[in-house]
């Protein structure tokens, strides 16, 4: 896999996204993804200072990084088997076509390099049969166990299958859409359990700013009511920890209505639905009077 992307390690037993490389940690920090350092010393496992890699990510962090093209999943054999079993025939065919297209691009690059060499020697590719055979021999690609000729050895189809497994089994789509909405608004997000929330939102890097919002899990925008006592309790909780108490939901019906107007059928699969549509999100902030 090209080193321009961050490697996110997944284990079939825990399902927790981890980042082990310090350069990758620095890179995703620049993208606004925080995570939590969870590495400790074997002789002092209870210590809570000077924690190091790996960096533990929220599932929303990992999905956002992969869908944005900034990262890829590194997984064990068991998870690979589960993901491969969910691939469709069309995805396998697309995978093969992408692989062959990459090989052909490599061959074309070798042809151009060889022609430039011949031109530098004031020769042409149409001299003798011997020279043409030598030229053709140089166009074959060796695919060793650790090939440097073809860097993209990780099939995109498997990455999509792993992503589908994560979204279907472990991720709430409404929570992810609120997460994505806040990320698009340039907020930094981390887990908010210590403040009675799903996320804690910062207006910038947490080393420079205090968190401003305690974001609650996504609500059913059309059917779930917001109890007045819940509003009062949330407002007082937000005031007590010096944060806005934020609730929100996803307006799925608007996206489905737009798809119907365009004579498109919304995909039934959760991931395909996420990729094909972009339903709008509404969020509301609540604070107790006299806040601050």
Swiss-Prot record:
Residues crossing the lipid bilayer are none
Molecular function per GO: lyase activity; nucleic acid binding; tRNA-intron endonuclease activity
| First-tier enzyme category under EC | lyase
Q: Does the keyword field hold Lyase?
A: yes
Q: Which GO terms describe its cellular component?
A: tRNA-intron endonuclease complex
Q: Which residues form the active site?
A: 202, 210, 243
What are the protein's UniProt keywords? Lyase, tRNA processing
Q: Supply the Gene3D superfamilies for this chain.
A: 3.40.1350.10
Q: Per the UniProt entry, what are the Gene Ontology biological process annotations, in alphabetical order?
A: tRNA-type intron splice site recognition and cleavage
Q: Does the keyword Heme apply?
A: no
| Highest taxon listed in the record's lineage | Eukaryota
Provide the catalytic activity annotation. Answer: pretRNA = a 3'-half-tRNA molecule with a 5'-OH end + a 5'-half-tRNA molecule with a 2',3'-cyclic phosphate end + an intron with a 2',3'-cyclic phosphate and a 5'-hydroxyl terminus
Q: Which InterPro entries does the record cross-reference, listed alphabetically? A: tRNA_endonuc-like_dom_sf (IPR011856), tRNA_intron_Endo_cat-like_sf (IPR036167), tRNA_intron_Endonuc_cat-like (IPR006677), tRNA_splic (IPR006676), tRNA_splic_SEN34 (IPR016690)
Q: Give its E.C. classification number.
A: 4.6.1.16
Similarity remark: Belongs to the tRNA-intron endonuclease family.
- Show the PANTHER family listed in the entry: TRNA-SPLICING ENDONUCLEASE SUBUNIT SEN34 (PTHR13070:SF0), TRNA-SPLICING ENDONUCLEASE SUBUNIT SEN34-RELATED (PTHR13070)
**Complexes and interactors:** Heterotetramer composed of SEN2, SEN15, SEN34 and SEN54. Interacts directly with SEN15.
- NCBIfam families, per database record: endA (TIGR00324)
Q: What does this protein do?
A: Constitutes one of the two catalytic subunit of the tRNA-splicing endonuclease complex, a complex responsible for identification and cleavage of the splice sites in pre-tRNA. It cleaves pre-tRNA at the 5'- and 3'-splice sites to release the intron. The products are an intron and two tRNA half-molecules bearing 2',3'-cyclic phosphate and 5'-OH termini. There are no conserved sequences at the splice sites, but the intron is invariably located at the same site in the gene, placing the splice sites an invariant distance from the constant structural features of the tRNA body.
- What is the recorded name of this protein? tRNA-splicing endonuclease subunit SEN34
């Amino acid at each position: 896999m090209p080193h321009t992307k961050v490697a996110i390690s997944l284990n079939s037993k825990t399902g927790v996204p981890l980042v082990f490389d310090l350069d990758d940690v620095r890179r995703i920090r620049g993208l606004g993804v925080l995570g939590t350092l969870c590495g400790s010393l074997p002789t002092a496992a209870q210590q809570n200072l000077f924690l190091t890699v790996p960096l533990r990510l929220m599932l929303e962090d990992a999905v956002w990084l992969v869908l944005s093209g900034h990262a890829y999943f590194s997984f064990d054999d068991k998870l690979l088997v589960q993901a491969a079993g969910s691939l469709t025939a069309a995805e396998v065919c697309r995978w093969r076509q992408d692989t062959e297209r990459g090989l052909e691009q490599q061959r074309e690059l070798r042809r151009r390099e060889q022609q430039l060499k011949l031109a530098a020697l004031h020769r042409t590719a149409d001299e003798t049969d011997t020279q043409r055979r030598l030229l053709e021999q140089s166009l074959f690609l060796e695919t060793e166990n650790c090939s440097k000729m073809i860097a993209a050895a990780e099939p995109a189809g498997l990455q999509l299958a792993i992503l589908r497994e994560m979204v279907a089994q472990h991720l709430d789509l409404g929570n992810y859409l609120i997460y994505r909405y806040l990320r698009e608004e340039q907020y930094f997000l981390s887990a908010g359990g210590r403040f009675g929330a799903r996320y804690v939102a910062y207006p910038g890097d947490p080393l420079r700013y205090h968190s401003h919002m305690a974001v609650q899990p996504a609500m059913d925008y059309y059917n779930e009511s917001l109890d007045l006592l819940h509003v009062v309790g949330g407002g007082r909780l937000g005031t007590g920890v010096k944060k806005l108490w934020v609730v929100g939901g996803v307006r799925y019906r608007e996206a489905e209505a737009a798809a119907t107007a365009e004579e498109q059928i919304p995909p039934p699969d959760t991931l395909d639905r996420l990729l094909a549509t972009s339903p709008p999100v509404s969020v509301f902030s609540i604070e107790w009077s006299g806040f601050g």
